[in-house]
Amino acid sequence: MEKYVSSMTCADFIVSTPDYFRYNPADEFITPEQIGEIAANTKASLSGTGYAVRKPAYLWMTEDALRQDYARYESAEQLDSHMSRLEHRGNMVMGDTRIEALDNSLFDKLQVLDGDISPMLEPDNNAIAIAVSLDDYGNLPNPEYYPKVGDTITATYADDVKYIDSRTGELRTEDTPEEYFQEKLYGARDVEYTVCALVELPNSMSYRYGGTGYDAVLSVDTAQRDSGGAAIPMLYLFDTADEVDEAEAEQYLSKLTAGEFSPLMYESKATARSEFAQFR
């Protein structure tokens, strides 16, 4: 049972909003005030916040790597057309990305496969960790897809993104065929990072969805600096020291989140154990 529990959650408790747990887009998740209230009413041996970067962000990657992503959805002809509409810098293209920021305390939850995450703990750092996808045996099936530790990788942040018609350079209309959609960035700026590690980011403390391009992790201070303060709390996570503290926290959160219209939800190891018991 504990193997199942560990696969379902990486912490004793994870708290956020229903939107987060139900994969709904939102402008706001759990608030600092709500986190403070929970922290004041529970006894944590480890705690911290995961943040969503709420600003358009991209990581530059090789065209071959991005082609691997889109080859799952597009024909060869569609793929060639798609790649031709992307901005290129040599053999590099601008790929979508999901950047999550973490409090320093939560770096303990990452499994480091290569490299070292300690540079991310230093003040005013430019270190980034790339989150990788492992197979069922814990192996990295496609290492060539990812940048290497020590590589410099460029992130582009933008204030806004709109789609234009690549034939005219004007904003797209409802009559513009999809093959002519092209992104146009406003207020774009580049930041160069050094890849310090390849890590496994537990799904239960991530965005909980994937996509094309890289998933990446920054320290919250670095993310706030480079995104212009666009990192907002997405989840609050904590562990407890013993069964007594765990039971008390479970009781508190159960009451806090009771009711159909509660602004908060939570997952815990206790709820995962309950789910496992129902499966048996």
Q: Which residues does each predicted region cover?
A:
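Basic-flanked hydrophobic alpha-helices used for secretion and membrane insertion
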Residues: 2-277
